[in-house]
Amino acid sequence: MMEFKVSPLTKIISLSGFLALGFLLVILSCALFHNYYPLFDILIFLLAPIPNTIFNAGNKYHTSDFMSDSSNTGQDLAHFLTGMLVTSGIALPVVFYHCQLIGHLSCIMCMIGGLIIYSSIVIFKWFFKKDFNEDDSLFG
């Protein structure tokens, strides 16, 4: 079976373009409508992966199984905080729209841009989860 391999440099370049698209959507949702409240959404989506990163730093090989008897309160708290921040990042533009602080197009652009920002951070962590010491070099 043929295995599809992508160099780490290609991954970084594609993810940076994906991240730039997310920032562009959020900034355009602010600049086109002369209202800069959606910039708070960038802050929330940038803070969202931090709890999982902090609590999973020393626990690289732990698999989360909800049926196991061992409990890891730190990881549960990290998952809760990350879920709360992602939900807040999605709901904040809706609240701004409901309060008539932003328009509906700005709300849609901000939500899509924020989700792109968060997903690019998660995909980056997923791509580079394995060690760089394997047979991949930086340029191929």
From Swiss-Prot:
The chain crosses the membrane at residues 12-32, 38-58, 77-97, 108-128. One of its GO terms (biological process) is late endosome to vacuole transport via multivesicular body sorting pathway. Its main location: membrane. Signal peptide: none annotated. The modification Phosphoserine is found at residue 137. Pfam families: Vps55. It is found in: Endosome membrane. It is a multi-pass membrane protein. InterPro entries: Vps55/LEPROT. Coiled coil: none annotated. Keywords: Endosome, Membrane, Phosphoprotein, Protein transport, Transmembrane, Transmembrane helix, Transport. Residues 33-37, 98-107 are lumenal. GO terms for cellular component: endosome; late endosome; Vps55/Vps68 complex. Belongs to the OB-RGRP/VPS55 family. Present with 2340 molecules/cell in log phase SD medium. Involved in protein transport from endosomes to the vacuole. This is Vacuolar protein sorting-associated protein 55. It comes from Saccharomyces cerevisiae (strain ATCC 204508 / S288c).
